[in-house]
Every structure is written in C-alpha cells, then in structure tokens.
A protein has these predicted regions:
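His-Asp-centered catalytic microenvironments across diverse enzyme cores
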Residues: 28-30, 39, 43-167
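Active-site neighborhood of thiol-dependent amide/isopeptide-bond enzymes
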Residues: 1-34
Length: 167
C-alpha cells in the first residue's frame, strides 16, 4: 500500500492525474494488492502501474493497458503481456502466469480508491476527515465500504474509469 501511495504522490507532484487503486478478492482473507492508475493524456486512458512488482501490462501489440482493460481481458481470456523486467521488490522475477493469471486475477474481483486523489489521502491526524471511497464492483455485490469511511459502489466501468478531465 505504501509504495503505491508514494508513487501516486510522485505522479501528482509531477502534474499527472493519478490514483492508488486497492485491488480486492471476492473474499478477503488477509490479502489484497494496491497499484496505481496514472492517466495518459496521449492515450486518453488510465494506465496500470505497479510499484511493488515494477510492472505494467500491454496487449499482444505492445499497447499499454489500464486496470479495467486488464481485468476485462483476463475475464475474457484475451492476451495480456507482462513487462519482461517485472519483479517483486527488485528481488524475484515475475511471470505473467503467476502475477497476472493467478495473483492479480484473484485480486481484481473489485477495485476501490479514494474519490479524491490527493497528498496524504489516508494520513490520519487530528481534524482531518477520512477520505470517501468509490468501488467498482460486479452486479449484485457490495464492497461494504471501509470501516469508518463513506463509500460508494458502482457497477459502471465507464464511470469509474472516466477521464479525470470530464465535467
């Protein structure tokens, strides 16, 4: 979580629209994974960036993919390609089969993030309100929110992944 929050704040400091995304399994058994979505003005979409695994994902033609696109491609058994130098904390090289097909497929049942991407989003100090969250969940599923936080669920991929420049 910390690495994704730090990368998010680096992206924000450089002027990029970014947010950290908590990727959740259907049943939480002490495991989830937090990655980043950074908005590309050139590609007009959010891109997958994972600081823990030094990972990004492309399609079979080398086009960068976003979290929603990877999720959909895994669901539909379409090709996804993990960058060749992906590794866990600069120690263990990762394979597409483990990282995407097993680990992330399990953790992409639903995704959640703060409504506002900002510095110190989850830093707790006197007088600071805990952020509101939005989750992209499958039909018929409820994220149940984060304890002590206001949370909203959406089933609409287009809404969740819309451009940060939309009015």
């Amino acid at each position: 979580r910390m690495m994704a929050q730090m990368l998010n704040e680096c992206y924000l400091a450089m002027g990029f629209k970014s947010r950290f995304i908590t990727c959740m399994p259907k049943v939480m058994i002490n495991d989830c994974h937090v990655i980043n979505a950074v908005y590309s003005n050139t590609l007009n979409k959010w891109l997958w960036m994972d600081p823990t695994f030094n990972a990004y994902v492309t399609d079979e033609k080398g086009n960068l993919l976003g979290i929603g696109e990877v999720r959909e491609r895994l669901r539909n058994n379409q090709p996804v390609v993990l960058n060749e130098d992906a590794n866990w904390n600069n120690k263990n090289k990762q394979t597409k089969e483990y990282y995407l097909d097993y680990y992330m497929a399990k953790n992409l049942y639903y995704v959640t993030c703060p409504l506002q991407s900002e510095y110190n989003a989850e830093t707790n100090y006197p007088g600071k309100k805990w952020p509101m969250y939005i989750s992209l969940v499958p039909e018929g599923y409820s994220s149940n929110g984060k304890p002590g936080a206001t949370a909203y669920d959406s089933h609409n991929d287009s809404y969740f992944w819309q451009s940060p420049y939309q009015e």
